[in-house]
Amino acid sequence: ELKLDESLYVNGVYEVSLDGQEYVMTETTTFDDYGMIYLVKLDESGVTLVSTQDGHLREVPADPTEGFEIESKVDVLGTYGGIRTYFIQDDKLTANDTIYEFAGDPSGELPELTVKESVNCRLEGGNTTLKAGDVIIPQAYSPDDGTFYFELPDGTAGNLLVDLSPDGSEGQMTYSGTIGGVDENELFE
């Protein structure tokens, strides 16, 4: 039995055939525009909810072996949504990568952040410090190790580590809103 107690409405229901197995993928919207995706397996024993994933489908691929782009809430340094590709493996939605690529605003534009105080980081050439007035453009985030990826306006790639803390659910770590113990709002605008 599939209960959608927390759902305000259903955005879409999709039939997925993969390696002879039939699934139904349901995308819902919950409170505060928060999304949830349910993967239901259909077989001779009936209908079984096998996997859930926070987020919204970006699109449904014609070939499910290509994976499903899912945009999830990722709130790190002023970003809001991040995209990962998930595959159906062993009856579960599984991401092959831990990195969320930032989605930007509806037009795809990524925000620029201006540095207010010195921030240690790593650029293509090695370790360095961003100085007040420098601008970075968020690109991606890995919640597994707290690496925040960015580019400078000239296209130079860089990254910095954000602080992680337990979020209270299953021992997972989440962004604490600080970098090196300093509140993000003191470091960036």
Regions of interest found by a model, annotated:
Residues 1-4, 36-53, 86-98:
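Surface-exposed loop/turn elements that mediate protein-protein interactions on large endomembrane-trafficking
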Residues 7-15, 52-65, 102-106:
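Repeated scaffold domains used in trafficking and secretory/extracellular systems
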Residues 7-11, 19-27, 33-35:
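Core segments of small alpha/beta cavity-forming domains
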Residues 15-28, 64-72:
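Acidic/hydrophobic-patterned starts of short beta strands in beta-sheet-rich repeat architectures
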Residues 17-19, 41-48, 62-64:
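A short, structured loop/turn motif at beta-sheet edges
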Residues 29-30, 142:
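Residue-level signature of beta-propeller blades and closely related beta-rich strand-turn architectures
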Residues 30-35, 77-81:
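Short, solvent-exposed loop/turn segments at conserved positions within beta-propeller repeat blades
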Residues 60-189:
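Acidic, small-residue rich beta-repeat scaffolds with periodic aromatic anchors
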